[in-house]
């Protein structure tokens, strides 16, 4: 019977193809699959490939009218995960034609849209994606990228400094602007709206934008440096978001901000296009990421969300701090930090990078280290992240016993001391505390900050021991 054979059949007959040679144009995905008891890994891997491409649960007539061979996803390799029982990495190749050009939204809908609720799987995690150059080229990417940002700001040879204004909710616009001014005046490059500051009853967005712009211009005039404040343009509708970005541009400020996961990729890409067309930098916050990436066996790893952001567009993105965490976590964080900044990243499983990624001159994104860091961390941060990064100290600035401006001074002095020491060839990993202590001698602001937060034990070795 050559004709149509109705009924349910195993996915692996069609979608498990271990001898498939991947093409340069394929989008490759690495899934961590935990099958239900009794489900063979090949069937589970094939189910993932089917469900993210042409598959459905039963044989259908219209399959006869489709070139399955051309359009089906293929599970081309499966390997057990070392040290985990009944867990596998399934590699899936999906043909380029399955995706709409320039749409991160469509890419995610296709690759992770349905399959995560699949009954045959106990859990599923998307660990990495290989975006082929042909697909990368359909995206605009970051509005400006690292080099253009440095030129706009006229700041070179060091990481940039930021500060999230706290308390995140409850300040009036005028008091908020005052805190912004003090931090910038003290020596920071940027201040930041908190991710949940949008436009609430106690502070409407337009008032905030106005007072922050005033703070920026006053600080610029007094310091002779270019300053910025990440004005959060995230809103309930795309139209409102663009309206806020337009107002920011009219005020002449350098940068706006967006929560790209809660706002959604479609909104984010629209905003990124607007920002490039109008010379605004775009700072991206990853609110909601832990909902998606925190579980080890289910969800989507942050490195995939980071790649997606580079395609959708953003000039900065929050990417963890590394400091004081475990060594392995450090390697993995540095892996996706490189994916954000570099043009070409080699496959390296020890850093969680499953595929070689070629970004073909898509602009890079500055990683932002933010959360629970203070002056004693500065040598470690300078060592780990290097020059192309933004270091953000919220409480580490506003918590200074003498006030906001001295808080900013302490951070700037600590940073300049670390950068100078590094440039002189000193070993920040070993001499970090000493470098900070020495700088305290000529900066009372730094000395006061060091007193409050005390020395921390550096739980890290020099970079070159890897």
Curated annotation (Swiss-Prot):
The modification N6,N6,N6-trimethyllysine is found at residue 5. It is found in: Plastid, Chloroplast. Substrate binds at residues 114, 164, 168, 286, 318, 370. GO terms for cellular component: chloroplast. The active site is at residues 166, 285. The disulfide bond which can form in the large chain dimeric partners within the hexadecamer appears to be associated with oxidative stress and protein turnover. It is an enzyme of class 4 (lyase). This is Ribulose bisphosphate carboxylase large chain. The lineage of its organism: Eukaryota, Viridiplantae, Streptophyta, Embryophyta, Tracheophyta.
């Amino acid at each position: 019977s050559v004709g149509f054979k109705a009924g349910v059949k195993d996915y692996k007959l069609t979608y498990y193809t271990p001898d498939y040679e991947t093409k340069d144009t394929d989008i490759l995905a690495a899934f961590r699959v935990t099958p239900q008891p009794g489900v063979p890994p090949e069937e589970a891997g094939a189910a993932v490939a089917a469900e993210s491409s042409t598959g459905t649960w039963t044989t259908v007539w219209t399959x006869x009218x489709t070139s399955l061979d051309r359009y089906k996803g293929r599970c081309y390799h499966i390997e057990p995960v070392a040290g985990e029982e009944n867990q596998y990495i399934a590699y899936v190749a999906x043909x380029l034609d399955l995706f709409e050009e320039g749409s991160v939204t469509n890419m995610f809908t296709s690759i992770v849209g349905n399959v995560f609720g699949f009954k045959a799987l106990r859990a599923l995690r998307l660990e990495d994606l290989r975006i082929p150059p042909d697909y990368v080229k359909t995206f605009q990417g970051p509005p400006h990228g690292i080099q253009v940002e440095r030129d706009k700001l006229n700041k070179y040879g060091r990481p940039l400094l930021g500060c999230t204004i706290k308390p995140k909710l409850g300040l009036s616009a005028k008091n908020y602007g005052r805190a912004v001014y003090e931090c910038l005046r003290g020596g920071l490059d940027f201040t930041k709206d908190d991710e949940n500051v949008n436009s609430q009853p106690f502070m409407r967005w337009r008032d905030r934008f106005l007072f922050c712009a005033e703070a920026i211009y006053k600080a610029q005039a007094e310091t002779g440096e270019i300053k910025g404040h990440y004005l959060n343009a995230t809103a309930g509708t795309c139209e409102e978001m663009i309206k806020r970005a337009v107002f920011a541009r009219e005020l002449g400020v350098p940068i706006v901000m967006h929560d790209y996961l809660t706002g959604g990729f479609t909104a984010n890409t629209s905003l990124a296009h607007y920002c490039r067309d109008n010379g605004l930098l775009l700072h991206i916050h990853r609110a909601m990421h832990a909902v998606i990436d925190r579980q080890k066996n289910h969800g989507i790893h942050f490195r995939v969300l980071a790649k997606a952001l580079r395609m959708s567009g953003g000039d900065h993105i929050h990417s963890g701090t590394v400091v004081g965490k475990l060594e392995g976590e450090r390697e993995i964080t540095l892996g996706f930090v490189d994916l954000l900044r570099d043009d070409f990243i080699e496959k390296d499983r020890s850093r969680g990078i499953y595929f070689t990624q070629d970004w073909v001159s898509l602009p890079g994104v500055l990683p932002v280290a933010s959360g629970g860091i203070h002056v004693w961390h500065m040598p470690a941060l300078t060592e780990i992240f290097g020059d192309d990064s933004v270091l953000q100290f919220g409480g580490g600035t506003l918590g200074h016993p003498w006030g906001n401006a001295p808080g900013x001074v302490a951070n700037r002095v600590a940073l300049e001391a670390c950068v100078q020491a590094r440039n002189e060839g000193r070993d920040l990993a070993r001499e970090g505390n000493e470098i900070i202590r020495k700088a305290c001698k000529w900066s009372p602001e730094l000395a006061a900050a060091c007193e409050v937060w005390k020395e921390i034990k550096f739980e890290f070795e020099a970079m070159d021991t890897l």
